[in-house]
Amino acid sequence: MLIAYDGTERAGRALEYAAQLLRPTTVEILTAWEPVARQTARAVSRTGIHQSTVSPDGVEEDPAYEEALKICRQGIELAESLGLAGRAHLVESATTISSAIIDAAHELDVDVIVTGTRALTGFRAWWTNSTADQIVRNAGLPVF
């Protein structure tokens, strides 16, 4: 079982429900992250401003990596508090977070993906990109 954990209350609730209802013994806790340099380049490219090519020397120096590591550790702590053995995975997102989660699920050969959702409906859901929705549509695996 792969738990897509981003540190939100929704992700924590999804982990708690999965522990109660699916009763796994071991879970793969996955936190997907995007380097700050890539986030900045994507944001700046929309404005037409010249993009800098400066990037940190190593992953460990990237503040986004440090934050993702902290979040993943919180997921492991939550899993252990629920009586589960958790294995931590950090995945750098090259395209979208949903693609990173799906690729990791296939690589880890899990049988189900657990993810939280914002449960948007109506007009807001139509205009808002949903990671959970993309996972459901493209994973080829059960999603809880």
What do these predicted ranges mean?
Residues 61, 65-76:
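Short, surface-exposed alpha-helical segments at coil->helix boundaries
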Residues 70, 77-113:
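Structural beta-alpha unit
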Residues 138-144:
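Short, flexible loop segments at boundaries between secondary-structure elements
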Residues 1-58, 82-87:
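Small/aliphatic-rich secondary-structure junction motif
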